[in-house]
A protein has these predicted regions:
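Core segments of cupin and vicinal oxygen chelate
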Residues: 34-84, 122, 129, 145-147
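A cross-kingdom feature marking solvent-exposed beta-strand/loop segments within repeated
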Residues: 58-74, 94-103, 135-150, 170-175
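Vicinal oxygen chelate
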Residues: 1-24, 28-37, 75-85, 101-175, ...
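Short hydrophobic/aromatic-rich motifs at helix boundaries and adjacent loops
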Residues: 12-15, 49-50, 94-97
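Aromatic side chains
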Residues: 33, 44-45, 51, 92, ...
Length: 175
């Protein structure tokens, strides 16, 4: 059985023999999360993580129904940004038959987004104060490309998972 700390090195060292097709990905635009309340979610993303509100919008009617393939969909949207990434928060106002999904990190279909941070312990404490709880204790990577990096998952009330990484090998964003 392979140690999980080898995964980052293995993926980073992988080479491909063929170039990507011309229609391939050339840039990441955003990561989207569906939440119960944009206002509650903004407390985490802005007050804890330090993102900035970029804009708000709403969608209803034919466009969003075709996009989601769900009749009667009405969405509220907030876009928030931090250096290098944008998060899209979506609050579904309709239809009413929605559910909260909270898969474990090992469950198929589980998704998370990861961020390097300046102070993992402070962020975990601030997150916990508003209901975003660490899934386990902070772990230290003991070898490979991420050696010395502390990391932890936190999950919010909506089931959104975020991985926090603090590394002595990655330049701090606080300058």
């Amino acid at each position: 059985m392979r140690d999980t700390n080898d995964l980052a090195v293995t993926v980073a060292d992988r080479t491909h023999s063929k170039p990507a097709p011309a229609a391939g990905v050339f840039r990441t635009d955003h990561t989207g999360f569906t939440v119960q309340s944009i206002e509650e979610s903004l407390h985490f993303w802005i007050d804890v993580m330090g993102f900035k509100l970029l804009g708000r919008d709403s969608f209803t009617g034919d466009f969003i129904e075709k996009m989601t393939n769900v009749p009667g969909t009405t969405l509220l949207q907030a876009l928030i940004g931090a250096p290098g990434h944008t998060i899209e928060l979506l609050q579904c106002v309709a239809p009413d038959d929605r559910q909260i999904v909270k898969p474990r990190p090992v469950d198929v279909g589980s998704v998370h987004v990861a961020f390097f941070v300046d102070d993992i312990d402070t962020l975990i404490g601030r997150a916990a104060a508003i209901g975003w709880n660490a899934l386990g204790p902070t772990q230290m990577v003991d070898h490979g490309a991420l050696k010395g990096t502390q990391l932890a998952y936190v999950r919010g009330p909506d089931g959104v998972m975020v991985e926090l990484l603090e590394s002595p090998n990655v330049a701090s964003g606080a300058s």
